Amino acid sequence: MLTIALSKGRILDDTLPLLAAAGIEPTENPDKSRKLIIPTTQDDVRLLIVRATDVPTYVEHGAADLGVAGKDVLMEYGGQGLYEPLDLQIAKCKLMTAGKVGAPEPKGRLRVATKFVNVAKRYYAEQGRQVDIIKLYGSMELAPLVGLADKIIDVVDTGNTLRANGLEPQELIATISSRLIVNKASMKMQHGRIQALIETLRGAVEARHQG
């Protein structure tokens, strides 16, 4: 049995056509089904529907053989028990710092609000900057407006939400897209099968990119 961990939303919607190219299609619509384990048209392949931030955990610990996760999630997770063999080139966005429009660069210790705590620590450590990192789970844009933080680190797509709240994107930390990840033990135990799937998906990604 091959188990593939996916999260609902943009990543799921963009991944399903790629899996379909490999002959793997869910027997129920994941967006409408309440089931978290969904069979597919291949009897020995199933999908696990989990939170986006949990996909690497399921794969690293072997509860899923493969998964699809955003590079932002993988950068924050930092797990060692994963291979990342393929950039699926879907769900593209940018991980950036942002602050109030026209605000001067703060002197001294910087306050940064983000859900990407590990990414933020690494980023500012590389710059040699002293920071206080404030963990938030959502509505990052609010933090600079009410004096909770000087800057935020968040995923930026169009930037419209930032602009609507008087903020502007500033420094690019990473360009983000979704990646196929594979459990290291699964890769050894089912190497031929997983490698064949990787190559099929690679072909589907290239065809989609060229199309």
From Swiss-Prot:
One of its GO terms (molecular function) is ATP binding. CDD domains: PBP2_HisGs. Pathway: Amino-acid biosynthesis; L-histidine biosynthesis; L-histidine from 5-phospho-alpha-D-ribose 1-diphosphate: step 1/9. Pfam families: HisG. It is found in: Cytoplasm. Its EC number is 2.4.2.17. Keywords: Amino-acid biosynthesis, ATP-binding, Cytoplasm, Glycosyltransferase, Histidine biosynthesis, Nucleotide-binding, Transferase. It catalyses: 1-(5-phospho-beta-D-ribosyl)-ATP + diphosphate = 5-phospho-alpha-D-ribose 1-diphosphate + ATP. The keyword Hydrolase does not apply. One of its GO terms (biological process) is L-histidine biosynthetic process. GO terms for cellular component: cytoplasm. Heteromultimer composed of HisG and HisZ subunits. Catalyzes the condensation of ATP and 5-phosphoribose 1-diphosphate to form N'-(5'-phosphoribosyl)-ATP (PR-ATP). Has a crucial role in the pathway because the rate of histidine biosynthesis seems to be controlled primarily by regulation of HisG enzymatic activity. NCBIfam families: hisG. Belongs to the ATP phosphoribosyltransferase family. Short subfamily. PANTHER family: ATP PHOSPHORIBOSYLTRANSFERASE, ATP PHOSPHORIBOSYLTRANSFERASE ATP-PRTASE. Lacks the C-terminal regulatory region which is replaced by HisZ. This is ATP phosphoribosyltransferase. It comes from Ectopseudomonas mendocina (strain ymp). The gene is hisG.
